[in-house]
């Protein structure tokens, strides 16, 4: 990763997500861009001062050599962010969600969910209750890649997952597929599963797991409830495909209690 973009609105949720972004930037030697998007009645001078304080605090708490800068944009949140993404070309966007612990829901129309739907950059969604320190705990070292096993050619996105996984102590990856009971996995999906396992297994201990359920989200949530060693969930947001589409990924972002990495097909 070369560039990480972290939108903040100065809420506790966004500042918590920023701590994840800063830790990732430090370990990846990446540039961190902290951005606040001002609505038409916002105070730009006050925002500049707040961003300066945030930059200073990050360098004190994370690393004095942290490559960090701040930006201000104006207008509609998603539209303004898309313009910044087009110019800055970040490899990852890190955003926080409010009230997203314990499977509590947030509004589907939230900024985080809209960014997932309307951009193609990987989005790392951080619930307000999540803490980066959990990545350093071996009891939460499982990464779950939930996938429909349709062909996925965006290896750059998979490399982002691999880099984030490397932050976890002794990480283990599980490729999770949810499908209805009494169904047979087609050969092309078996091949995709083997590709995913081979992509990660040299650096990360990897295995497969199948959950039988007629509803993808219910199946994933049941799995997460039963397997308490999960520290990170990754999903693929697609424009097409039978199982995990963008609206499923948006729904997961609305009630996950774990950090959630959304990877886009293109």
Feature annotation, model-predicted:
Residues 1-16, 117-157, 254-266:
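Intrinsically disordered or low-complexity boundary/linker segments at protein termini
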Residues 155-165, 196-197:
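Anionic-ligand binding region
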Residues 83-133, 224-266:
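Gly/Ser-rich helix-loop-strand patches that form or flank binding pockets
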Residues 184-240:
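Glycine/small-residue-rich hydrophobic helix-like segments
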Residues 72-80, 212-217:
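Charged docking surfaces used in two-component/phosphorelay signaling
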Residues 67-70:
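Rossmann-fold cofactor-recognition segment
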Residues 23-56, 168-196:
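Acidic, proline/glycine-rich short linear motifs
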Residues 23-28, 135-138, 163-171, 253-256:
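Short, conserved loop/helix-junction motifs that constitute active-site signature segments
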